Amino acid sequence: MDTLTRFLPEHLQQNQLPEALGGVLLSVVSACTEINAKVRLGALAGVLGMAGTGNIQGEDQKKLDVIANNIMIDTLKANPAVAGLASEEEDTFVSAGENGRYLVLFDPLDGSSNIDVNISVGTIFSILAKPEGALATESFLQTGRQQLAAGYVLYGPQTQLVFTFGHGVYVFTLNAENEFVLTKENPKVPESTKEFAINMSNRRHWLPPVQQYVDELLAGETGTRGKNYNMRWVASMVAEIHRILMRGGVFMYLQDKRDPSKPGKLRLMYEANPMALILEQAGASASNAYQAMLDIQPESLHQRVAVIMGSSEEVDYLNRLHSK
């Protein structure tokens, strides 16, 4: 089986991609390998619990949020090809290599609310080309279609790296020697599914299209959809999307009635766009209920967005309910 270091040069050459772009991916992987070691030790390393600080989103930070964020920033700033970074945990962008050609955006520890109870978490990342001119916030505000690469590392029962350069999706598993080994090429998400993922505790806040959709799913084979569905909910986007990538399903985190000014909870740049690129490469769909996720023009670094992702039959159906 190919290791990442053997696979990557050949993949870059086959698809006429710059070696420096592969180097940025390797920097991300190096950082994630270090984060993995911290996650694995947990309480033994004293890294669990709250940090006593908050991020730009107004969310309380866990110790591992801060640790993972610092590891990502320090590792990526050491790569001269990286011009700038944007993190879910930082107020604004971070400048890096003066002559760098790439921008990296990331959620250093997605699902960190689960870390103290030993449920899977992960790191999500996106790589963009740096536009000409001085680095500014606007440099990062590119659509998801402009991503050069996207991926995530899942810290679960196995530690797995999933990424795409826009030429298929590849899954690597970390072995005992701390090397990522290719274990799956080009997974495909089935068009139809019998699984859905949503936080049912928010049901009373949902908008009518979501209420109708979930009611139809719960009606089972005697309802309008004509089949029985199972619900899943981990409260860790990386874990939810990885399950969908491996066996299908649909994941939803949508706008609701609690705050009409807030389109959703998840971040477009750090979470939705990278996951959308991976899923589209695997034959799935992703939208904000009204347009394809990858076509949304971002207006700010920390922009939130409604999310529907997964098996295209379900995404398309829920999109149609929103358009009525």
Curated annotation (Swiss-Prot):
Enzyme class: hydrolase
Pathway recorded for this protein: Carbohydrate biosynthesis; gluconeogenesis
Protein residues bound to substrate: D110, G111, S112, S113, N199, K265
Protein name stated in the entry: Fructose-1,6-bisphosphatase class 1
Pfam families, per the entry: FBPase, FBPase_C
Keywords, in A-Z order: Carbohydrate metabolism, Cytoplasm, Hydrolase, Magnesium, Metal-binding
NCBIfam families on file: PRK09293.1-3 (NF006779), PRK09293.1-4 (NF006780)
Enzyme Commission number(s) from the entry: 3.1.3.11
Main location: cytoplasm
Reactions performed catalytically: beta-D-fructose 1,6-bisphosphate + H2O = beta-D-fructose 6-phosphate + phosphate
Quaternary context: Homotetramer.
GO MF terms held by the record: fructose 1,6-bisphosphate 1-phosphatase activity; magnesium ion binding
Family statement: Belongs to the FBPase class 1 family.
Cofactor or coenzyme needed: Mg(2+)
Cofactor-binding details, from the entry: Binds 2 magnesium ions per subunit.
Taxonomic source organism: Neisseria gonorrhoeae (strain ATCC 700825 / FA 1090)
GO biological process, one term: fructose 6-phosphate metabolic process
InterPro entries: FBPase_C_dom, FBPase_class-1, FBPase_N, FBPtase
Disulphides: none
GO cellular component terms given for this protein: cytosol
Compartments, as annotated in UniProt: Cytoplasm
